[in-house]
Amino acid sequence: ELLWPHLDEYVDKTIKFIRRQGRYPDFVHGHYPDAGYVGICLSEYFGTPFIYTGHSMGRAKKARLLEQGMGEAEMNKRFKIDHRIQTEEQILARADLVVTSTHHEIEKQYGLYDNRQVPRYAVIPPGIDIETFYPYYHDKLDESEHSENTRYAQASMLGELNRFFLNPDKPLILALSRPDKRKNISGLVKAYGEDLELQAMANLAVFAGLRKDIDAMAENEKEVLTEMLLAMDKYDLYGKMAIPKKHDFEYEVPALYRIAAETKGVFINPALTEPFGLTLLEASATGLPIVATDDGGPNDI
C-alpha cells in the first residue's frame, strides 16, 4: 500500500534503465496489483504483450474484511482497497494473459470483476520437488540414500515435538502455516480443544511461522499467535499440543510430514480460504493423508 504513490516514478526510471541497456522485453509479466500497474505501463510503452498473475485479489479481500466487521473507511485508510480494485480492473482490461493456480481462482476471484472476460486465462498449478518430499517409508528401505542433513532434521524435529507431548507415540495432527487470520489456526485449536475423544486419540502440532519474541512481531501476527496460546490454555492442551517456535523449510518441514505419516496421523489445512495449498501437495507426497478447507485451491487438488 505504501508503494502506490511511487509507482509512476518507478515506471519512468525502469524505462530509462531498459533503454540504456539497449535490450527490450519480449513481454512483461506483473505479479500483484502494484507490479501489475507497472507492467501495463511498460507493456504499452514498449508495445509488448502483458501477462498478469494476481495471487490475491482486492474484491475478495474487501469481502473478507467486511465479514470481519471492518468499515470501508478503515479499509481504504489501511489498504487503499478501492484504489487497488480500480487498478485491478485496469489490469484485467489490458492483460493479454492471466495466469492462475486453479480454476476456482478464475471463477471465485477474477469472476468478481467487471473486466473478467477480457483476458485469456492459463491455469498453471504449482508443483513440488519429489526428491525432497518423498514417502516416509523410503527411509526404511535404504537409509544410505539420504543425506546427513535429512537424518539430522528427522531427529531434531522428533526431539522438538517430544518435549511438548506427554504421550509422543499417538498419531500426530500436523498444521503448518504462517500466523495469518485467514489460516484459521484458532479454529483448529478450538475444534481439537472441544473434542476430548480426539485428544485421547491424537496429538496436535501447530507450526505457525517463525518467531523469537511475539511482542516484537507485526500486530496481525501477534494477534493470531496470542489467540492460539489463549485457546491452548483455555482447553488445557498442555502435553497434547506442540507449538514450536522455528523450523527450516529445506530439511525440517519434509521431515515433519514424514514423522506425522509414520505415526498414522494427518496434515490439516483449516484455512478459511486457500488460493492453492502447496503444503497439501507436499504432505501427500510423503504419504501423509490430508484434510483441507472446502474453499479455493484444495478443491482442484
For each of these PLM feature ranges, what is it?
Residues 1-301:
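Catalytic cores of nucleotide-sugar-dependent glycosyltransferases that transfer UDP/GDP/TDP-activated
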